[in-house]
């Protein structure tokens, strides 16, 4: 869904992407229709807290799909499907991949799609009722939110760090905590995302998820 002019997105020419137009007001009404209490959704930024509930909110749209997910709009993606296959995501029937709010993938099942509701009685910031009725951003999609609930749920997850978390305060491509790394990135239709690193005088090529 987008509130932008769909015609201008046709330049992407992506056969596996379907764009649907929906105003923010109509989206708010759609989200509200899924809950029996008055939600707080005054600005698009608050949607960060609702991302983990998309499997529940958009359950009609997701019928027929085995998995769903979300990611930030400034993420440069590698070959997601190849990555999941290489790490036996489907073979092991993992319920979720993800560590941070950059990108997460969920199995499309009723049990998994309701995990975000399981924080009642734990603490204030993990109770979805508190999260969805407050104007405050709870970073519910991050490590101190949905991650805690999935750890408690007992579902099997793919949890290793397969991404490069780039420090946006520097011009050069460095991860948080790195000092003067020597790294370049390239992307191609054939090979996806590739990082070229100079480590101890040797060139090391990696294929991060993002």
Predicted features by range, described:
Residues 113-210:
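Catalytic core and acceptor-binding pocket of nucleotide-sugar-dependent glycosyltransferases
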Residues 2-6:
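Conserved short acidic donor-positioning loop in nucleotide-sugar-dependent glycosyltransferases
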Residues 50-93:
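GT-A fold catalytic core of metal-dependent nucleotide-sugar glycosyltransferases
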Residues 7-11, 28-29, 76-80, 85, ...:
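Short catalytic/ligand-binding loop motif for oxyanion handling, primarily in non-cytosolic enzymes
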Residues 89-105:
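A short, conserved acidic/glycine-rich loop-to-beta-strand motif
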Residues 15, 71-73, 99-102:
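Residues that flank catalytic or metal-binding motifs in active/ligand-binding sites
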Residues 8-63:
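Active-site-proximal specificity loops/subdomain of glycosyltransferases
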């Amino acid at each position: 869904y987008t509130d932008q002019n769909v015609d201008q997105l046709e330049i992407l020419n992506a056969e596996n992407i379907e764009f649907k137009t929906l105003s923010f007001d109509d989206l708010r009404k759609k989200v509200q229709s899924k809950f029996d209490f008055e939600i707080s959704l005054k600005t698009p930024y608050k949607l960060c807290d609702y991302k983990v509930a998309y499997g529940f909110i958009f359950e009609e749209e997701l019928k027929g799909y085995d998995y769903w997910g979300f990611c930030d709009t400034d993420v440069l993606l590698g070959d997601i499907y190849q990555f999941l296959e290489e790490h036996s995501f489907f073979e092991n029937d993992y319920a979720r991949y993800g560590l941070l709010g950059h990108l997460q993938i969920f199995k499309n099942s009723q049990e998994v799609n309701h995990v975000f509701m399981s924080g009642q009685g734990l603490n204030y910031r993990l109770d979805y009722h508190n999260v969805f009725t407050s104007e405050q951003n709870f970073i519910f999609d991050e490590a101190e939110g949905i991650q805690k609930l999935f750890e408690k749920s007992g579902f099997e997850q793919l949890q290793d760090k397969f991404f490069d978390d780039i420090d946006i305060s520097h011009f050069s491509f460095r991860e948080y905590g790195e000092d003067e790394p020597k790294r370049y990135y390239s992307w191609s239709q054939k090979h996806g995302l590739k990082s070229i690193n100079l480590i101890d005088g040797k060139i090391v090529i990696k294929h991060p998820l993002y």
